[in-house]
Amino acid sequence: AFGAQFVFTVSAHYSVREGKSDTSKAPNHLPWYDWDSCEEMVLPNKCKLVGVELIDDAIELPSFHHPKQAAYVLGPEMGSLSKEMIKKCDYTIKIPTKFCINVQIAGSIVMYDRIRSLGKFAQRPQTEVEQKDD
């Protein structure tokens, strides 16, 4: 979904390929990288790493200009990105919420924001548009 070109994990504590919640069966359609540590990560040339983390100095998602070539990394469910991973990130962004949200929801929000901001979609109207009756 959302035009992803590859998927990766770092220090995963489970087998992604056996995940029950992946209804799209991503490992069957996308290149998949499993790295044991941040040091082993090798992203494509010119690819910016964007961390998604609820920290004070992160850029709020609505203000973030997504790089055209980017990989997004999210922390584990009920956890956070490691300090090493945050240091490796070119940018750190946050979804402006008052509390943490499910990692799958966070990933979907970020990727939707990316496709919306980089896509060639028409501008939204400034006022409510009247709906046509069927």
Across the structure, where does each feature detected by a protein language model lie?
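Post-transcriptional modification and biogenesis factors for structured RNAs
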Residues: 1-134
